[in-house]
Regions:
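N-terminal ligand-binding/catalytic initiation module
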Residues: 1-66, 76, 86, 227, ...
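Short helix-loop-beta connector
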Residues: 82-89, 111, 169-170
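Conserved beta-strand elements of the Class I
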Residues: 90-91, 247
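Glycine-rich Rossmann-fold phosphate-binding loop(s) that bind the pyrophosphate
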Residues: 94-96
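N-terminal Rossmann-fold NAD(P) dinucleotide-binding loop
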Residues: 99-100
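NAD(P)-binding Rossmann-fold cofactor-contacting core
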Residues: 109-132
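Rossmann-like adenosine-cofactor binding region
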Residues: 135-219
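Adenosine-phosphate binding glycine-rich loop
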Residues: 185-285
Length: 285
């Protein structure tokens, strides 16, 4: 929807985790101008979580919060496998809602002490600092300041790179979380070419992930992609090794992540009698 500077995504998935399985679909948008024009979130999502045995809709969930949490979790998983073990500093470029779950999730798997946050919107930066200053040594900074940290998460919708290769530390791990549509591009091409480059899904990242622009232009090809994060998680490929320098995780977000997150939320709600039961299909009467 270029006329509205936004887009919709329909994200269905079935997940078989062995001891449980589930299905679901998320209807979600990205409209960067929402906050300014309508006082609405940039991302608004709705998740329908279903029983795959009979297609019965078990729950309707807030897909916006679900997206925030699973995106932070995805970055944390990648950081766990690709960042240095003693990473104590985290840089974040983009101080919107995703920045909060980046810090919350990543700090659970690395001993983060120092946080540098960068955004063109000084009010967003101030809110972020106010939220976390009692837990971390957190301060505002430039994109260059943030990029010098042990771990960097970029969560912006830009189409012109904002992170240069020379800004990164020798062993910085970068979570490129912002690119989720064709044309978006946060990292300079030489960052991607110099790094151990890990993606979440080949079809999605080559079309709309961080690598979509250089891949489409032929600057980067399949030989430059180390592998998918799933291959590392299950042990098919190694994560960080002693020889690795900069590492990059290109995340577009997967529908199976939404189903997995919805499963956790649904099971917790069911066990603790949370939520609001209602007869959506008129079966109780």
């Amino acid at each position: 929807l270029p006329q509205y500077n936004g887009d919709f995504r329909s994200m269905p998935a079935y997940l078989d985790a062995g001891d449980w399985d589930a299905a679901g679909i998320k209807w979600v948008n990205v409209h960067p101008d929402n906050r300014e024009q309508f006082d609405l979130p940039t991302v608004i999502g709705t998740m329908i979580y279903s029983d795959p045995r009979n297609a019965f809709p078990l729950a309707i969930l807030d897909g916006t919060e679900l997206t925030m949490q699973r995106t932070g979790a995805a970055a944390a998983v990648a950081t766990d496998h690709l960042a240095v073990e003693d990473a104590t500093s985290l840089g974040i470029i983009g101080a919107g809602v995703q920045s909060y779950t980046q810090l919350r999730a990543i700090s659970t798997i690395r001993p983060i002490e120092e946080v540098v946050v960068s955004d063109l919107d000084e009010e967003k930066v101030a809110r972020f600092v106010d939220t976390f200053e009692g837990e971390f040594d957190v301060r505002p900074g430039t994109p260059e300041d943030a990029a010098a940290c042990d771990v960097l998460s970029t969560v912006t919708p830009v189409e012109s790179p904002i992170v240069e290769r020379e800004w990164l530390g020798e062993h910085t791990h970068v979570n490129a979380m912002g690119a989720d549509a064709k044309g978006k591009h946060e990292l300079a091409d030489d960052v991607l070419l110099d790094a151990k480059l890990v993606i979440d899904d080949y079809e999605q990242t080559t079309h709309s992930g961080e690598i979509n622009v250089p891949y489409g232009e032929g600057v980067l090809d399949d030989e430059d992609i180390y592998g998918e994060i799933g291959q590392i998680v299950v042990g098919e490929k190694e994560g960080r090794t002693a020889e690795d320098g900069v590492t990059v995780f290109d995340s577009t977000g997967l529908a199976i992540q939404d189903v997995a997150a919805a499963h956790v939320v649904y099971e917790h709600a069911d066990e603790n009698d949370n939520g609001y039961p209602f007869d959506l299909m008129g079966l109780d009467g």
